[in-house]
Amino acid sequence: MEKANASTSAKTIDQLCKECNLCMHSLQILCVFCRKTLSTAEVYAFQYKDLNIVWQGNFPFAACACCLEIQGKVNQYRHFDFAAYAVTVEEEINKSIFDVRIRCYLCHKPLCDVEKLRHILEKARFIKLNCEWKGRCFHCWTSCMENILP
């Protein structure tokens, strides 16, 4: 990607594309961790997950799918506070879990209400990482469960 305007206030892929007059499928942006160019699918996934771009040296960076998952695992090991059921989470934050943003701890996608409800119905715990509550999205739930099923 050509050097973006250093005065840009873009925080998301969508904002960056609008400010630089680019279409999302033609955007070439590097991963902040491994420096590889994100594929078109990864660019769209990054936007879908409502993640913010990172600015370094007046250049925008995102994160590829592989590095997002690795970073999720690293955060689990380095910043694990504790795990709790939805009732405990709600008591701690004084809000319904349906009223707060909870991201997947692996892929970082914000959980929808159905994914939060699944935690409740299946009595799965949310985990607190670095003072933020996290859970599992449907995609990561399935991949986690594949390892324990016969």
From Swiss-Prot:
Q: Which GO terms describe its biological process?
A: DNA-templated transcription; regulation of DNA-templated transcription; symbiont-mediated perturbation of host apoptosis; symbiont-mediated perturbation of host ubiquitin-like protein modification; symbiont-mediated suppression of host innate immune response; symbiont-mediated suppression of host type I interferon-mediated signaling pathway
Subcellular localization, per the record? Host cytoplasm; Host nucleus
A Pfam family annotated for this UniProt entry: E6
Keyword Zinc present in the record's keywords: the answer is yes
Query: Miscellaneous notes for this chain?
Result: Belongs to the low risk human alphapapillomavirus family. The cancer-causing human papillomavirus E6 protein has a unique carboxy terminal PDZ domain containing substrate but low risk E6s do not possess this domain.
Q: What does this protein do?
A: Plays a major role in the induction and maintenance of cellular transformation. E6 associates with host UBE3A/E6-AP ubiquitin-protein ligase and modulates its activity. Sequesters tumor suppressor TP53 in the host cytoplasm and modulates its activity by interacting with host EP300 that results in the reduction of TP53 acetylation and activation. In turn, apoptosis induced by DNA damage is inhibited. E6 also protects host keratinocytes from apoptosis by mediating the degradation of host BAK1. May also inhibit host immune response.
Q: Quote the protein name from its UniProt record.
A: Protein E6
Organism, scientific name:
Pygmy chimpanzee papillomavirus type 1 (PCPV-1)
Gene transcribed to yield this protein? E6
